[in-house]
């Protein structure tokens, strides 16, 4: 059985003139390197709205940088209130 990890949404995936609310950069606790983050690719991520309880699911698609952050693609775009909130990894 896999352990549940908690992470924090750092930001949307951004370009010079655009941002993509469907893809987010997330840092998980205990993940400190690119190789550790690469082991999370393909796993499911769940964000739950703190007030309404609405759930948006996503999937880890790639690493981001060399310090353990990952890029997650969600099924729907996340609201701006989601930035800085917690997600769980299954």
From Swiss-Prot:
UniProtKB keywords: Ribonucleoprotein, Ribosomal protein
InterPro entries named among the record's database cross-references: Ribosomal_eL33, Ribosomal_eL33_CS, Ribosomal_eL33_sf, Transl_B-barrel_sf
Listed Gene3D superfamilies: translation elongation factor selb, chain A, domain 4
Residue ranges of coiled coil: none
GO molecular function: structural constituent of ribosome
Keyword Ribonucleoprotein applies: yes
Biological process, per Gene Ontology: translation
Keyword Transcription regulation: no
Any single GO CC term annotated in Swiss-Prot or TrEMBL for this entry: ribonucleoprotein complex
HAMAP family in UniProt: Ribosomal_eL33
Family: Belongs to the eukaryotic ribosomal protein eL33 family.
Protein name listed in UniProt: Large ribosomal subunit protein eL33
Gene: rpl35ae
């Amino acid at each position: 059985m896999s352990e549940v990890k908690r992470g924090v949404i750092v930001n949307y995936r951004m370009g010079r003139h655009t941002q993509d609310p469907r893809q987010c950069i997330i840092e998980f606790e205990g993940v400190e390197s690119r190789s550790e983050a690469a082991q999370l690719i393909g796993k499911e991520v769940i964000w739950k709205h703190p007030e309404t309880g609405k759930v948006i699911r996503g999937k880890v698609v790639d690493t981001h940088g060399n310090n353990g952050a990952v890029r997650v693609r969600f099924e729907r775009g996340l609201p701006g209130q989601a930035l800085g909130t917690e997600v769980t990894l299954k």
